[in-house]
């Protein structure tokens, strides 16, 4: 029996989605079983049909359910899934246990982790309308598609990346996949025998994916301009994974001179490549982002460009892409010729239509303005409610910033005190892969993309209470 709780912060459609997803994964809802009609489900739970429809669309986006014309939604038939990952290139990363988090999900009132989003901003109406039209009008999408992703979507992505990020590519060079982690697994196969330099601090999941697929990683500590070239040379690596437009998690932007040095490093020896993850590049509030490294190096330069739609749309819509230079593209097409693409063709075509009709560009513009206002409101509320010596870094771009509280008694104390007030965040040291000696001791990473505007004052007040409690305990 599904129970929804209107008093909770989580939207009703997300509660319904979570309940149904759990039943599907546990086997309580068997493959092939019809889900209740929207009107029936809405009447049973006392909610609107739009709420039910949004939850069902999310299940379809996750591959847990499918729609059948004039029949409704059904639990996905496990045996009928065509899209599989190459077994030799992707191994699930080990499940890490967060060091400073609250174990009970219900205790969290304000999620300041970097992976959360405000689901109310998702363009459910236009996305759902396109998807519904495709379900009825494009039955050929049930057939197996191009291994790199449907060509018309790749053309839309190539045009968008060229206009907004200066990426120099054709649709033929674009490979669509179910998340950057999956694409990194493919690259690990192509770069077998290599060693990768990765940013420290940095995105630990990247290191896990590469190492799980046989690519040893060497952490290189960043400076105020990003990854230092001298340290990169000393690492002995022939691959370099970087987030130059918005380093995760510090927010540092790699300046043009350092970018030129990095490209020179890659060009100096055959077999060197840069893996450019254009993380959070859509959300820059003060100035336009610098062009991508890939655009600076050219279509066949030593750069693989990666990006995802997880922040611009939603993490549950598993669509990412990479742009390969010609030599690597030919190897990819040869080595992965027997594998199907990992993204549902309905999802691919929904995104294609969403981009082609201008919805995506307008959505990004609205998101950028919305998040800019929330960033400014959150920063102002934090400054008003916390210590006058509070400093924020990295707020000019991306959807999180570094929050430094001098004299707080250490980041773990801050994380634990915040958790007691119902706030989830992480300490900066959690993003270090080794040698966190240079990590600022009183610094946490605060994401605001999951905060709704009306929750900002209360979230800042909760952190204020946590800060005052720590001040008293230190004294």
Task: Give the positions of each predicted feature.
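Short glycine-rich anion-binding loops that position phosphate/pyrophosphate groups of nucleotides
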Residues: 117, 245-247, 311
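Walker B catalytic acidic pair
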Residues: 277-278
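Structural preference for beta-strand elements that scaffold enzyme active sites
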Residues: 273, 304, 443-445
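Conserved core of the PLP fold type I
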Residues: 131, 138-271, 282, 288-299, ...
């Amino acid at each position: 029996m599904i129970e929804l709780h209107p008093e909770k912060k989580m939207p009703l459609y997300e509660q319904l989605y979570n309940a149904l997803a759990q039943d599907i994964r546990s086997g309580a809802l068997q493959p092939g079983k019809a889900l209740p009609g929207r009107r029936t489900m809405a009447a049973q739970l006392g909610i609107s049909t739009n709420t039910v429809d949004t939850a069902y669309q999310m299940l379809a986006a996750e591959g847990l359910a499918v729609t059948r014309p004039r029949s409704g939604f059904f639990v996905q038939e496990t045996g009928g899934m065509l899209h599989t990952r190459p077994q030799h290139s992707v191994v699930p990363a080990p499940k890490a246990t967060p060091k400073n988090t609250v174990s009970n999900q219900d205790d969290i009132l304000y999620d300041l982790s970097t992976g959360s989003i405000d689901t109310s901003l998702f363009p459910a109406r236009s996305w759902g309308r396109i998807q519904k039209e495709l379900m009825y009008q494009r039955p050929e999408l049930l057939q197996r598609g191009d291994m790199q992703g449907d060509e018309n979507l790749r053309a839309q992505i190539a045009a968008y990346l060229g206009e907004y990020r200066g990426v120099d590519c054709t649709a033929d060079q674009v490979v669509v996949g179910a998340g950057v982690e999956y694409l990194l697994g493919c690259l690990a196969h192509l770069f077998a025998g290599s060693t990768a330099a990765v940013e420290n601090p940095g995105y630990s999941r990247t290191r896990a994916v590469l190492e799980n697929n046989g690519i040893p990683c060497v952490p290189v500590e960043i400076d105020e301009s990003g990854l230092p070239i001298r340290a990169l040379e000393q690492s002995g690596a022939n691959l370099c994974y970087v987030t130059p437009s918005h380093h995760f998690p510090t927010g540092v932007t790699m300046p043009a001179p350092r970018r030129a040095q990095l490209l020179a490093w890659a060009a100096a020896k055959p077999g060197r490549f840069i893996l450019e993850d254009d993380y959070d590049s859509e959300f820059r509030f003060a100035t336009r982002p610098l062009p991508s490294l890939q655009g600076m190096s050219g279509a066949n330069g030593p750069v693989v460009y990666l990006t995802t739609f997880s922040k611009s749309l939603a993490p549950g819509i598993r669509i990412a892409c990479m742009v390969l230079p010609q030599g690597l593209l030919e190897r990819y097409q040869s080595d992965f010729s027997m594998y199907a693409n990992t993204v549902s063709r309905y999802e691919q075509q929904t995104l294609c239509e969403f981009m082609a009709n201008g919805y995506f560009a307008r959505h990004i513009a609205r998101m950028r303005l919305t998040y800019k206002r929330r960033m400014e409101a959150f920063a102002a509320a934090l400054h008003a409610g916390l210590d006058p010596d509070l400093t924020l870094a990295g707020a000019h771009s991306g959807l999180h910033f570094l929050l430094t509280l001098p004299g707080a008694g250490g980041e773990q104390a801050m994380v634990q005190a915040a958790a007691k007030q119902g706030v989830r965040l992480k300490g900066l040291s959690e993003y270090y892969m080794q040698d966190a000696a240079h990590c600022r001791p009183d610094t946490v990473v605060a994401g605001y993309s999951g905060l709704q505007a009306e929750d900002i004052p209360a979230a800042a007040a909760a952190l204020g209470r946590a800060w005052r409690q720590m001040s008293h305990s230190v004294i």
